[in-house]
């Protein structure tokens, strides 16, 4: 039985990989200095939750087949140092996935935005038709126990390909490990400025990625992204290239319909970005053996990935949506989708700035007009988060100028922000909450109850 130890086992991706390997019959151990829900309960149920928090070099021994190193660990981590000393093979998360899938057809979904949704769409369609594949996805999907599934027998491996760094000691983007046979790139919008300081540096990662596609492979790309189209066409890699765009659709009584040769198809999701995602997912599914009619039947029941334009509640008049959007292109796409779908409603868009990039004075201008579809735009950020990072807090004026939106309110106190929401009248209104954080501790139950009381 193979034995692997996870350094930083509690992370979203890491604990899912640990569970997948445990289910595959490997012996798994791990460490972390903090483990939160749902990781904690899921690891405990499998019997692989660390008994005590912290880093313990004595857990590292020559009987291990390898170490899987998470991004949360630091370079000077005592367990990592012991593993280096003993000469144990140290894998980054993506490197290990590649090792496990060398004999499979690797299908990778990449791009600055839409990765999780497109991967979820493909997985939903394959599951609908009971087609078994291995997979790694970046969000919990309804009907799937884990975000990672690995077998010896499945032919395909579907991977959500992230451009962020592989590990603390491997500064390559994760997706450069995967060497796909088939890949989709949804778009390129500068992100992760803490590791890609210039836009050109960021774009260069995607150029390198396109060149890493296996010879004879297929690149599916969003032709409406001019930068992506250019670098796709420029690549000299011996691959097939297929472009996609937003398909024909219309909205009637709050429902989005896709125009198809088989007739008008009602969808559970909405927004041009999601329609574009559907067009891309269709290409990938067809390349994985699902025909167009089968795809359309299955996609009509897709409700969306967790935290992506997730409807928390509605009463027919008022709606509360939650979205993971935080990068400028994602915020703009989500905002525009809601504005188009709910033209008659009063719309309040709230965005929390809490990532390294979003709070950077040189980057915040990328958010210009991102909230322009709102009747009332709100930005929340916690100055304490900047102090922890030894950064100077942004002024209210800096934020207003950056967003270029007249009707913008800025909150820096969680209590004041919640008070604003709980004193607002939500009759025939849309409240869209966008963040990869939690607004300083949002009481979602109280907010939902209030919004739906009108």
Locations of the language-model features?
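Phosphate-binding loop of NTP-binding sites
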Residues: 20-24, 58-62, 71-221, 227-238, ...
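Beta-strand->loop->alpha-helix junctions that form or flank phosphate-binding loops
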Residues: 52-55, 91-98, 136-139, 235-253, ...
């Amino acid at each position: 039985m193979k034995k692997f130890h996870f350094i930083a086992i509690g992370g979203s991706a890491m604990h899912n990989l640990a569970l997948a390997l445990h289910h595959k019959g490997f012996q798994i151990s791990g460490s972390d200095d903090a483990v939160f829900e749902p990781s904690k309960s899921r690891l405990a149920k499998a019997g692989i939750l660390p008994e005590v928090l912290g880093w313990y070099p004595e857990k590292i021994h020559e009987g291990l087949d390898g170490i899987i190193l998470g991004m949360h660990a630091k370079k000077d981590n005592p367990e990592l140092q012991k593993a280096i000393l003993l000469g144990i093979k140290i894998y980054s998360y993506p490197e290990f996935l590649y090792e496990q899938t060398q004999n499979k057809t690797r299908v990778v979904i990449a791009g600055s935005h839409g990765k999780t949704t497109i991967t979820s769409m493909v997985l939903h369609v394959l599951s609908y038709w009971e087609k078994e594949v291995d997979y790694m996805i970046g969000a919990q999907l309804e009907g799937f126990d884990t975000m990672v599934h690995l077998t010896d027998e499945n032919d395909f491996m579907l991977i959500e390909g992230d451009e962020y760094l592989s590990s603390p000691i491997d500064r390559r983007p994760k997706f450069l490990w995967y060497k796909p046979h088939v890949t989709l790139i949804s778009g390129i919008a500068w992100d992760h400025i803490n590791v890609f300081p210039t836009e050109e540096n960021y774009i260069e990662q995607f150029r390198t990625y396109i060149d890493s596609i296996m010879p004879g492979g297929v690149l599916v790309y969003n032709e409406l992204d001019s930068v992506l189209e250019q670098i796709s066409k420029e690549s000299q890699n011996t691959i097939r290239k297929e472009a996609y765009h937003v398909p024909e659709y219309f909205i009637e009584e709050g429902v989005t319909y896709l125009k198809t040769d088989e007739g008008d198809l009602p969808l559970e999701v909405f927004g041009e970005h999601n329609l574009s995602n559907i067009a891309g997912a269709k290409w990938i599914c067809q390349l994985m053996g699902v025909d167009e009619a089968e795809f359309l039947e299955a996609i009509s029941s897709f409700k969306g990935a967790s935290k992506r334009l997730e409807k928390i509640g509605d009463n027919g008049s008022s709606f509360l949506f939650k979205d993971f959007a935080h990068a400028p292109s994602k915020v703009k796409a989500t905002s525009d989708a809601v504005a188009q779908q709910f033209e008659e409603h009063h719309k309040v868009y709230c965005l929390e700035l809490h990532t390294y990039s979003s709070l950077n004075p040189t980057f915040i201008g990328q958010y210009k007009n991102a909230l322009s579809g709102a009747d009332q735009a709100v930005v929340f950020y916690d100055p304490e988060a900047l102090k922890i990072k030894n950064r100077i807090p942004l002024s209210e004026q800096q934020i207003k100028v950056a967003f270029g939106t007249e009707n913008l309110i800025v909150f820096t106190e969680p209590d004041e922000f919640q008070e604003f929401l709980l004193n607002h009248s939500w009759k025939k209104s849309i409240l869209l909450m966008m963040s990869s954080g939690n607004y300083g501790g949002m009481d979602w139950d109280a907010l939902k109850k209030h919004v739906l009381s009108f």
